[in-house]
């Protein structure tokens, strides 16, 4: 099921008990209650930050297949074609698009 995230500096939270407007809770059993935060800066660059999840967050570069572990408190850029992996059970493909 595609999830559209409006470009904003507030962004959205992803997790089993994600809160806030647009929170994404359609995740696997190994995803933390508040797992990750995704947002867009004022230059339209997208980022993800791990929220001290139990099972980790990984960005897989769509062009190189290089995996980057997202450390809590550190933001990692997201690009179209990348995959965002939350734990072992949940993967999102990063696409650029409009409603």
What are these regions (language model features)?
Residues 92-99:
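Short, compositionally biased
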Residues 4-88:
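Forkhead-associated
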